[in-house]
């Protein structure tokens, strides 16, 4: 776990307004907030904000991978899982036998959005002379990243807490191959004799 550091350096990043007590004031303020003191002013080093966005993108990416797998398991021809019913919003307009994996799609879309935000956040590292206007973009990206991450977590919670796992269908799918999907150990044993 990497905590976000606090920030207290003043407008120019020098603590000039705090005089000779600047570091002491910063240390006490961070202790009171329960945050570590930053190594450098955020005016010159943008990595802390970028790291937060990258962390959120990683979190959403993990949830997006799970959602992608779940959406495939809900396919009619696989049928090993079903999303919680969405009151008709998940029904296909053209295929009455099909339920669309709306929750999985929402999680995957949130993960894609956060990946795009991560790329933009990385661009914000290259601010010219500390004040090039990129900071405005960074503020927007960080705020949007938290909003999208919250949605991703909320929808994932709904998806996973209501997920129907169809063990009987999993068993049927495994039996289709008549054991061939479990034949790796046989292959390894035979390889020793070739």
Whereabouts are the PLM-identified features?
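Internal glycine-rich alpha/beta core junctions
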Residues: 1-124
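Glycine-rich cofactor/substrate-binding loops
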Residues: 93-194
